[in-house]
Amino acid sequence: PYRMLPAKEYFTLKTGNDKFHSERGMPNVMTYESMLRTFSPEGIWPQDNEWGMHDYTREGAQGCTSFNEIIAKGYGEPQSAKEFAELAQWVNYDGHRSLFESRSQNRKGLLMWMSHSCWPSMVWQTYDYYFEPTAAYFAIKKASEPLHIQWNPATDEVEVVNYSAGTHKGLTAKVQVLNMDASVAWEKEATVDSNEDTTD
């Protein structure tokens, strides 16, 4: 899919996770600073045809309606372009990280559609037209670590993914769930082993 899906759905896709996938993507909103450079003062908010000119269309491959719904469900309706752009970075990070983390079981590979756009766009990029990295860049980098810990929302389990970091014994894994104000809501620590080329 090229539209945004809830994180769990990337882990439970009926087709695609069992093979190399040559392109996947989702809306990927640029930073607010880049939006100020892109949109006219009249067109920056609310979302309108000017957004569509920069690929943020509610229908078609981009499917930005689902992106808006995920923001509203998780954080409430944004009241400004600045608030939308800030919330979108959280959603983009979660979505892109889940997209890559969901591939860890079968290890079949994934190419991102795409790294950058040829003009100011709100979709399918890891850095924007102005070379500003988006949340996607950092999420993909994190999800692709040679030795990585992740939460699998389909099984509600924490997994240690070891792509190529060698075998490690006696690692300490610490999990924290944070509130929106960054206070710790829950945490747990465990000692784990990780064999090379495994997801446990």
Positions of PLM-derived features:
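Substrate-binding clefts and catalytic carboxylate motifs of secreted carbohydrate-active enzymes
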Residues: 3-169
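Beta-strand-rich binding/interaction modules
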Residues: 156-200
